[in-house]
Regions:
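Alpha-helical ligand/cofactor-binding cores
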Residues: 130, 144, 162
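Short alpha-helix carrying the canonical HExxH Zn2+-binding catalytic motif
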Residues: 126-131, 213-214
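Post-HEXXH active-site segment of zinc metalloproteases
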Residues: 123, 127, 138-155, 228-233
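Histidine-centered, transition-metal-coordinating active-site segments
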Residues: 3-104, 108-114, 121-122, 154-389
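Short active-site segment of divalent metal-dependent hydrolases/proteases
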Residues: 135-139, 218
Length: 389
């Protein structure tokens, strides 16, 4: 009978000094293990090993290329400034209204959930989602509309986001992101009448398509919450079909749309679906794409129209919205006339005084724009606050 202190004969102890103290972990094996995991993703998923950068770099030891891009997006000052840029309300005073920063975090979260459900590349979705709005102006789309009218050649925040990550960040070096991420950032925007158009996304990666639809869905979810919280609209004002289909609570709306997109886009997994598809596709006409069911898509499209008519457009047309537009216009004209006030490095990178003025104003937060406007034209910024505490 073996005593409680006996050691089984098959267990052997080695003196510590017989174990090599010079053995070092192979950190590159971490990246290889992560890349190997990507091989189990959908055959339609983007793989980090296939990514390219404008300037080739040695691989990181513990991260895939898309994970590196995600990390690069969150460190620049342009990302940090998003916390003080408007989503809808102009310079909101309440603590809980959505900012541009919380918006991109929600887009990344919704996108990752969809990508996980479809066995696509979550890291790529997250990198695009976090970086897609880096180029937004102060006061949201109000500021964007002003610069689009005043700048030769127009202005769009998605193009400016690409300009930031490829040129303006890091004193002209840019972030050197992969083409997958840059393409997703460039093509995330959705014209008001083309929310669920297949033709608009057929040349995008599935991960970029996920961010595109997640951006719109996150908009609706948190903007409805903000509109209700501020009493700008009442729950009973919302289209009845939308409330019945999506639910009354924020969490219900988010869960409903994520589940519907995953179910409707199941062919993106490459798995056998309920109709018997074997996951193989011939030609562009049968290429899988990210979508909603026709029924819920119609409801969401109608809800989006409602939000434009009852929330977004009225905000832009409000006294505060008009003042915000006037501030952006004033600052652009001011710095275009006096380019010597713009940081020298930015002027050098921008290529022209007009472009430098747009780049400078676009980089401002709401509060900084208000402060600068007060210096240029005292009193102009008075009353430019929306949202209830």
């Amino acid at each position: 009978m073996m005593s409680s202190t006996s050691v089984p004969s098959h267990i052997v102890f080695y003196p510590m000094d017989t174990i090599s103290r010079n053995t070092k972990p192979d950190l590159n094996s971490v990246r290889r293990r992560l890349e190997l995991r990507e091989e189990s993703l959908s055959p339609f998923a983007s793989k980090s090993v296939d990514s390219v950068r404008a300037i080739p770099e040695d691989p990181a030891s513990t991260r895939t290329e898309f994970q590196r891009d995600r990390d690069r997006v969150i460190h620049p000052n342009s990302f940090r400034r998003l916390k003080h840029k408007s989503q809808v309300f102009v310079a909101p005073q309440g603590d809980h209204f959505t900012t541009r920063l919380t918006h991109v975090i929600e887009v990344a979260q919704v996108g990752r959930s969809i990508a996980r459900g479809l066995n696509l590349n979550e890291d790529l979705v997250e990198a695009i989602g976090l970086g897609h709005d880096l180029g937004h102006t102060p006061f949201g789309h109000i500021g964007e509309s002003v610069l689009n009218q005043m700048l030769s050649g127009g202005f769009h925040h998605s193009r400016h986001s690409v300009r930031l990550v490829t040129l303006l960040e890091k004193d002209g070096r840019g972030l050197n992101l992969t083409e997958h991420v840059i393409d997703g950032i460039r093509n995330h925007s959705k014209p008001e009448g083309q929310f669920l158009s297949r033709s608009a996304v057929e040349n995008l990666s599935l991960e970029a398509q996920i961010v595109r639809i997640s951006d719109a869905l996150a908009y609706l979810a948190h903007d409805i919450l903000d509109a209700l919280r501020s009493d700008f609209i009442k729950l009973e004002d919302l289209p009845k079909k939308a409330v019945e289909a999506l639910g009354e609570r924020h969490s219900q709306r988010v869960d409903t749309v994520i589940s519907n997109v995953v179910e409707s886009s199941w062919d993106c997994t490459g798995e056998i679906d309920v109709e018997g598809s074997d996951g193989s596709y011939e030609g562009d006409s049968s290429k899988p794409w990210i979508r909603m069911s026709p029924e819920l898509g119609k409801i969401v499209t109608d809800l989006r129209v409602f939000m434009f008519e009852r929330f977004y457009h009225p905000i832009s047309a409000s006294v505060e919205g008009r003042k915000a537009a006037a501030i952006v216009g004033l600052l652009f004209e001011h710095f275009n006339r006096k380019p010597e006030l713009i940081p020298a490095k930015l002027r050098e990178l921008s290529g022209s005084d007009e472009r430098a003025a747009a780049d400078y104003v676009c980089g401002m937060t709401d509060n900084y724009a208000l402060m600068m406007a007060e210096q240029v034209k005292p009193g102009l910024s008075a009353g430019v606050f929306q949202g209830r505490i």
